[in-house]
UniProtKB/Swiss-Prot annotation:
Belongs to the G-protein coupled receptor 1 family. Gene3D superfamilies: Rhodopsin 7-helix transmembrane proteins (1.20.1070.10). One of its GO terms (molecular function) is G protein-coupled receptor activity. This is Probable G-protein coupled receptor 33. InterPro entries: Formyl_rcpt-rel, GPCR_Rhodpsn, GPCR_Rhodpsn_7TM. It holds the Pfam family 7tm_1. It is found in: Cell membrane. The lineage of its organism: Eukaryota, Metazoa, Chordata, Craniata, Vertebrata. Residues 1-30, 87-103, 166-209, 269-283 are extracellular. The gene is Gpr33. One of its GO terms (cellular component) is plasma membrane. PROSITE patterns: G_PROTEIN_RECEP_F1_2. Orphan receptor; could be a chemoattractant receptor. It comes from Rattus rattus.
Length: 339
């Protein structure tokens, strides 16, 4: 019996996603590889520019710090895309060794968890800034934001340890080396007991990833922005809702882009039919690539009207990511809040 394995991340294609010869069909393979290469080129340039502007050309504030780390998580993901694309072009053959198999997938997992955690942190920060302005003025500092960022990276790294443990390479006896998760605990892969245990471990890893990397952050973000929107409406502050629009754009783009990935992971877990799995895999790769490349651009253009685009790029960055509008709302709310 074959070992219990899964693509785990979209870096490899499950055996169920191939045609009768065991090789991914040419059209989806070419589309996926092209999307990954284009995302690498555009994402490296755009995210690199964002990081440079936020780090060296803007004032160090809570907002710029959180956005810097969010975009850093996107930038890390883009650096792995060429290796994924090469694997797809070589019929899912992994030519970079077992160490990089573990490292790249673990790094991709870290960036995934970090990005959703930073989106959650930004929404919670916006919640406190709008609904608890006095507390925010007393505690909301760049040093506080730096500590939050450090904890997020540590937590994302801890949650990604399973990819260092279970990810490995193996020969599929068809001339290809696969980089996949092996959830079998032990060397006796024929044992039904080990097969059952492996299936339970696979299910536990999927549940942990879906719960902590998607569902719970989604509920936190929805709650925070619902309360923020209600408060802003009550106080008539929607004219100053630029940061709110930026955050909402980030949230929508992230969850729309990551939903196909979690759907695909669920189909792999349940050993669904090949066609739905293949479609969701291709969609997941394209949407995740879209998320790492386009989301930062969306923040920029939803953060200010088109007239500001006629100004310098630096002015546009400052207008989008600065705390000025948030501070104005805080001062307005603070004047109406009883201490």
């Amino acid at each position: 019996m074959d070992r219990v394995n899964s693509s785990g991340h979209v870096i490899s294609v499950s055996p169920s996603l191939t045609n009768s010869t065991g090789v991914p069909t040419p059209a989806p393979k070419a589309i996926i590889a092209a999307a990954l290469f284009m995302s690498f080129i555009v994402g490296t340039i755009s995210n690199g520019l964002y990081l440079w502007m936020l780090k060296f050309k803007m004032q160090r504030t809570v907002n710029t710090l959180l956005f810097f780390h969010l975009i850093l998580s996107y930038f890390i993901s883009t650096l792995i895309l060429p290796f994924m694309a090469t694997s797809f072009l070589q019929d899912n053959h992994w030519a970079f060794g077992s160490v990089l198999c573990k490292v790249f997938n673990s790094t991709l997992s870290v960036s995934m968890f970090a990005s959703v955690f930073f989106l959650s942190a930004i929404s919670v920060d916006r919640y406190h800034l709008t609904l608890h302005p006095v507390w925010s003025q007393q505690h909301r500092t760049p040093r506080w934001a730096s500590r939050i960022a450090l904890r997020i990276w540590i937590l994302a790294t801890i949650l990604s340890i399973p990819y260092l443990v279970f990810r490995e390479t193996h020969d599929d006896h068809k001339g290809r080396i696969k980089c996949q998760n092996n959830y079998i605990v032990g060397t006796n892969w024929e044992s039904s007991e080990h097969q059952t245990l492996g299936q339970w471990i696979h299910a536990a890893c999927f549940g942990r990833r879906f719960l902590l990397g998607f569902l719970l952050p989604f509920l936190v973000i929805v709650f925070c922005y619902k309360r923020v929107a209600t408060k802003m409406k009550d106080k008539g502050l929607f004219k100053s809702s630029k940061p709110f629009k930026v955050m909402l754009t980030a949230v929508v783009s992230f969850f729309v882009c990551w939903m196909p990935y979690h759907v695909h992971s669920g189909l792999v877990l349940t050993k669904s039919q090949p066609l739905p799995s293949q479609l969701t895999l291709g969609l997941a790769v394209v949407t995740i690539s879209f998320n790492t490349v386009v989301s930062p651009i969306l923040y920029l253009f939803t953060g200010e009207n088109f007239e500001v685009f006629k100004k310098s790029i630096l002015a546009l960055f400052k207008s989008t990511f600065s705390d000025s509008s948030a501070t104005e709302r805080t001062q307005t709310l603070n004047s109406e809040t009883e201490i």
